[in-house]
Design a protein with these regions (language model features):
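Internal alpha/beta core interface subdomains
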Residues: 1-24
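Active-site glycine- and acidic-residue-rich loops that bind
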Residues: 1-2, 29-32, 36, 62-83
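Structural preference for beta-strand elements that scaffold enzyme active sites
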Residues: 15-17, 58-62, 87-90, 138-140, ...
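Glycine-rich phosphate-binding active-site loops on the catalytic face of alpha/beta enzymes
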Residues: 20, 88-98, 145, 151-178
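Glycine/Thr-rich beta-alpha phosphate-binding loop at enzyme active sites
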Residues: 24-32, 36, 80-135, 175
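Short beta-strand/loop segments at the ligand-binding rim of alpha/beta enzyme cores
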Residues: 50-69, 131-141
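Catalytic cores of alpha/beta
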Residues: 69-83, 130-135, 145-162
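C-terminal helical cap(s) of enzyme catalytic domains, especially alpha/beta-barrels
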Residues: 99-111, 166-191
Length: 191
């Protein structure tokens, strides 16, 4: 499926996300295991090389990982991304944990949890990826960005870019402007 999707989207895409972390797709997260991921990344990279030649353009591949990984698994994934020269990583998808929301009846429903309960967990994964990758590939920080401060924290933890989901739903399109203004006013990131 990934190879078919890659072939179909490649001519039209600016970049392609390979999501191996959706909690809503049965058994998908098993693809984050070292042996399976190694094989998948190898096949994707070979296909990307062929498609680059066919279409005369390089479309970056970005791997989206889960926040519910052990430190060992995060390090293993980071090393595989380096080994296969993957173009970027998205840290992270939604979580299957329900820490901090156990009191709500909806917490027992299946699927991924996003928003504020995810902030710290996603930032922890981002920080660990940053430490292992050492700026070798871009990291897109996502997960629990509910304020301009959260966005700045992602950048400070090693994100090269950020993505918004739940924060955008709650705050609307002006949320993007608020974040850009806050980040640009930070002397460290004024360029």
């Amino acid at each position: 499926d990934y190879l078919i999707g890659l072939r179909k989207a490649y001519p039209y895409a600016s970049y392609i996300t390979i999501n191996i972390s959706s909690p809503n797709t049965q058994n998908l997260r098993q693809l984050q295991g070292a042996d399976v991921l190694d094989q998948l990344l190898n096949r994707l990279k070979l296909e990307q090389t062929q498609l680059t030649q066919t279409h005369g353009k390089h479309v970056p591949l970005v791997i989206k990982i889960a926040p519910d990984l052990s430190d060992e698994a995060i390090t293993s994934i980071a090393n595989l991304l380096l080994k296969h020269q993957i173009d970027g990583v998205i840290a992270t998808n939604t979580t299957i944990t329900r820490t901090g929301v156990e009191q709500f009846s909806v917490s027992k429903e299946p699927g991924g949890l996003s928003g504020a309960p995810l902030t710290q967990q996603a930032s922890k994964v981002l920080g660990q990826l940053h430490a292992v990758l050492n700026n070798a590939i871009p990291i897109i920080g996502v997960g629990g960005i509910m304020s301009p401060k959260d966005a700045q924290d992602k950048i400070d933890s090693g994100a090269d870019l950020i993505q918004l989901y739940t924060g955008l739903i709650y705050h609307g399109p002006d949320f993007v402007r608020e974040i850009v203004k806050a980040v640009c006013s930070n002397p460290v990131h004024s360029n």
